[in-house]
């Protein structure tokens, strides 16, 4: 599945370069962008509240509720992240009609609490978002708090930990690629899809060419999240969906 990304700051659709808030590109009204994605065949939207991600007190809940309603009216599924800190945050979003809630830094800083969420909520409604930095020794270290803090926790360690409580969806981003149009880390996705075949992996970061969609699908990922390439009209969602459908999946 191809999932277009919609990142929001102060009610505006934006993209960050490598997660830096000071490196923003603005693309205007999120409703008109959402409408374009609907027209081009979207079946799911990836929405991130970047204000909420930076400070949970600034979550754009009214906007999220309206965008979710618009998505549902258009028969779109929606997954949302940004500033999720409590079980009540998840309940609120699911009540809005959100299909999946994305859990980022909180899953690393408070694993005991988040593992309880996996037993309380349907694991299919939760997405574990792991941003990783790959060092010179090819260690895949998890980065948290909007990519501001590198941990010594390995990607594989986190997946294995949450796999024990029914983990279904993992969104994995190589932060050196995100928002750069520099291409995807195909080897990363090949290895994790091979190791955990029952988990649905979402690839994110750097997709700049339609040919990468072919490579990513053959790597075994369940879906690809694409943001900047659509917003800057490198190719259309319609073209990306067609490319995905024509690709031969590793199954």
Swiss-Prot record:
Top EC class, one word: isomerase
Gene Ontology cellular-component terms listed: cytoplasm
EC number: 5.3.1.16
Molecular function terms from GO: 1-(5-phosphoribosyl)-5-[(5-phosphoribosylamino)methylideneamino]imidazole-4-carboxamide isomerase activity
One Pfam family, short name: His_biosynth
Coiled-coil stretches: none
Active site positions, chain numbering: 7, 131
Keyword annotations of the record: Amino-acid biosynthesis, Cytoplasm, Histidine biosynthesis, Isomerase
Subcellular location: Cytoplasm
Name of the protein: 1-(5-phosphoribosyl)-5-[(5-phosphoribosylamino)methylideneamino] imidazole-4-carboxamide isomerase
Protein's organism: Blochmanniella floridana
Gene for this chain: hisA
């Amino acid at each position: 599945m191809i999932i277009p990304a919609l990142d929001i700051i102060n009610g505006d659709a934006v993209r960050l370069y490598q997660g830096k808030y000071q490196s923003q590109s603005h693309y205007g009204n999120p409703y008109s962008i959402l409408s374009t994605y609907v027209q081009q065949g979207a079946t799911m939207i990836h929405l991130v509240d970047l204000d909420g991600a930076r400070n949970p007190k600034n979550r754009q809940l009214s906007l999220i509720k309206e965008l979710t309603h618009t998505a549902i009216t258009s028969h779109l599924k929606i997954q949302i992240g940004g500033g999720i800190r409590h079980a009540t945050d998840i309940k609120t979003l699911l009540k809005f009609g959100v299909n999946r809630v994305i859990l980022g830094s909180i899953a690393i800083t408070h694993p005991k609490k988040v593992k309880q969420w996996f037993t309380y909520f349907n694991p299919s409604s939760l997405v574990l978002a792991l941003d990783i930095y790959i060092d010179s020794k090819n260690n895949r270290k998890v980065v948290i708090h909007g990519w501001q803090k590198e941990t010594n926790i390995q990607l594989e360690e986190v997946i294995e930990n949450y796999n024990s409580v029914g983990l279904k969806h993992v969104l994995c981003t190589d932060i050196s690629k995100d928002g750069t149009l520099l291409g995807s880390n195909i080897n990363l996705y090949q290895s994790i899809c091979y190791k955990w075949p029952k988990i649905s992996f979402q690839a994110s970061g750097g997709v700049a060419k339609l040919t990468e969609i072919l490579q990513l699908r053959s790597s075994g990922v369940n879906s690809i999240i694409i943001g900047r390439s659509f917003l800057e009209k490198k190719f259309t969602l319609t073209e990306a969906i067609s490319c995905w459908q024509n690709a031969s999946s590793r199954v």
